């Protein structure tokens, strides 16, 4: 079987918001790829030895001084190159074509391009046919500048009414440019275009798949740690859970998982983690019940950022104490994933990205003197979930809504107290249970309950009560950068409210948060 890294695509990032999406689409096709800065050196490209190169989009203008350019070696490496949006423009300009600055006539949003010439990139692809019999493609545009003259050796492959060069190709050199974004779902045939590029034009094999990734990760863990022991902070979240399963498969009993119950988890979550990983999967777990330690440290603190720092510090202190008890451990495992290791760098434009050599997401002490094992550092979140399923983890755990690292510590507004956490846990469990029962859970991106430290008058039977208020929050979003509040049915919200107030002594009122992001954030703190 081929090594899963043998066939690969290099994506050069010029700062587009869609660049990581390109990488995810190539991975979904089954081909390994990496995302690098646009100003990468010739030596680095040669060492990586890609089967093809993609020049991604970006916010700069090719017509501006000091705007980013692809390394000249890209066009001399003898491999296919695909330029997307800005990538097409810089390809055209660098190879002798011309780009003009857009003046109020850019294309933003849906467009339909008409195919003008046959190309390997668009082979057997069409969404409709024009009156003249030419293929039409529904695409997503986002550009101001445009190519006004294509380089020598290129032909026009597609156009729109306002963009005469919506796609271009030099089939002999296997250079292609598209002014639209094939990586977004609005470009209906975008995935097939990227498949043509990666599989047919670059001739990559599609062996980047969950079973192969697991096999490769297990082999690399064994090679890295040998017979040494490894410790892992297991939270029950997606990343640490998948790391635990990979390490368990690779080294078995030489893995020790430290599970810290901070008293800020969801209802019965600690028991569920211990039962699944300890009883069901047979992992070696050290359970630390630290609820009182966290709550004592949080006492009297109401400021959100201060609460986060306290929770983080107490966790680090506890993990440090427990790890030192594992005297034979030589390695620390972490759930670092690929987006974690991409950070902005100070290039000429400030738009490049670099790969960190090390990303200690836990903020653990430097004097621990442990080697670092990061088996997920090549993977996007969706890939982590897929290999989690392959490893036997339950779907409902892997695809749960996001839960903040500080847990209920930032969903109890103001000072965190045990009473508040206990009430919030039960209210949140009712909300989530009802979402599942109504088949609404997977129709919203995130849903949770917030405890408000205010009392409100209520009526129960013949008596009045003066108890706490909770807010329900549900949002719909694609990327969590912006979000709309979810328009849940009124009868559903009424049912949730009635259950919370009737079943939980201590809550007298339930409200629903109808704030979008922006101006509000998704979490309240």
From Swiss-Prot:
Enzyme class at the top of the EC tree: ligase
Domain GMPS ATP-PPase per the UniProt entry, residue ranges: 208-400
Keyword Isomerase: no
One Pfam family, short name: GMP_synt_C
Binding-site positions, ATP: 235-241
PROSITE patterns: GATASE_TYPE_1, GMPS_ATP_PPASE
UniProt EC number: 6.3.5.2
GO CC terms: cytosol
Function: Catalyzes the synthesis of GMP from XMP.
PANTHER family per the UniProt record, alphabetical: GMP SYNTHASE [GLUTAMINE-HYDROLYZING], GMP SYNTHASE-RELATED
Protein name: GMP synthase [glutamine-hydrolyzing]
Organism: Shewanella loihica (strain ATCC BAA-1088 / PV-4)
Gene: guaA
């Amino acid at each position: 079987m081929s090594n899963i890294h043998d066939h690969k695509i290099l994506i050069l990032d010029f700062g587009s918001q869609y660049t990581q999406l390109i990488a995810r689409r190539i991975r979904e096709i089954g081909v390994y790829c990496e995302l690098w800065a646009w100003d990468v050196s010739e030596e680095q490209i040669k060492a990586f030895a890609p089967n093809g190169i993609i020049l991604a989009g970006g916010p700069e203008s090719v017509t501006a001084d000091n705007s980013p350019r692809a390394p000249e070696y890209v066009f001399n490496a003898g491999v296919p190159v695909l330029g997307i949006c800005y990538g097409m423009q810089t390809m055209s300009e660098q190879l002798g074509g011309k780009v003009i600055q857009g003046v109020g006539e850019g294309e933003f949003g849906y467009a339909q391009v008409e195919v003008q010439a046959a190309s390997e990139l668009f082979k057997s692809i069409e969404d409709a046919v024009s009156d003249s019999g030419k293929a039409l493609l529904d695409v997503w545009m986002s550009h101001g500048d445009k190519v006004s003259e294509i380089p020598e050796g290129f032909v026009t492959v597609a156009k729109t009414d306002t963009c005469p060069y919506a796609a271009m190709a030099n089939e002999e050199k296997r250079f292609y440019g598209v002014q639209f974004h094939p990586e977004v779902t609005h470009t209906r045939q975008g995935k097939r275009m990227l498949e043509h590029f990666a599989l047919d034009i670059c001739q990559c094999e599609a062996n980047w798949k969950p079973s192969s990734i697991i096999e490769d990760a297990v082999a690399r863990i064994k090679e890295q740690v040998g017979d040494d022991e490894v410790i892992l902070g297991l939270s029950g979240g997606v990343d640490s859970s998948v790391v635990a399963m990979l390490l368990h498969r690779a080294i078995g009993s030489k893995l020790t998982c430290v599970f810290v119950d901070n008293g800020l988890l969801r209802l019965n979550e600690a028991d569920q983690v211990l039962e699944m990983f300890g009883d069901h999967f047979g992992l070696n777990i050290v359970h630390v019940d630290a609820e009182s330690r966290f709550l004592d440290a949080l006492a009297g603190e109401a400021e959100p950022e201060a609460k986060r720092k306290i929770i983080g510090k107490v966790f680090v202190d506890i993990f440090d104490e427990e790890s030192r008890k594992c005297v034979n451990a030589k390695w620390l495992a972490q759930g670092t994933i690929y987006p974690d290791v991409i950070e902005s760098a100070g290039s000429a434009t400030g738009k490049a990205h670099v790969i960190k050599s090390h990303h200690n997401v836990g903020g653990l002490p430097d004097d621990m003197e442990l080697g670092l094992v990061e088996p997920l550092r090549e993977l996007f979140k969706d890939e982590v979930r897929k290999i989690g399923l392959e490893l036997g983890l339950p779907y409902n755990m892997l695809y749960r809504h996001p839960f903040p690292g500080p847990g209920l510590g930032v969903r109890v507004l103001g000072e965190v107290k045990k009473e508040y956490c206990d009430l919030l846990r039960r209210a949140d469990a009712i909300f989530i249970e009802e979402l599942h029962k109504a088949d609404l859970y997977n129709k919203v991106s995130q849903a949770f309950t917030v405890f408000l430290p205010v009392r409100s008058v209520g009526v129960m039977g013949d008596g009045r009560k003066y108890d706490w208020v909770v807010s329900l929050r549900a949002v719909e979003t694609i990327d969590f950068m912006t979000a709309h509040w979810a328009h849940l049915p009124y009868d559903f919200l009424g049912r949730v409210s009635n259950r919370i107030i009737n079943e939980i002594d201590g809550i007298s009122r339930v409200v629903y948060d109808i704030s979008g992001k922006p101006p509000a954030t998704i979490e309240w703190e």
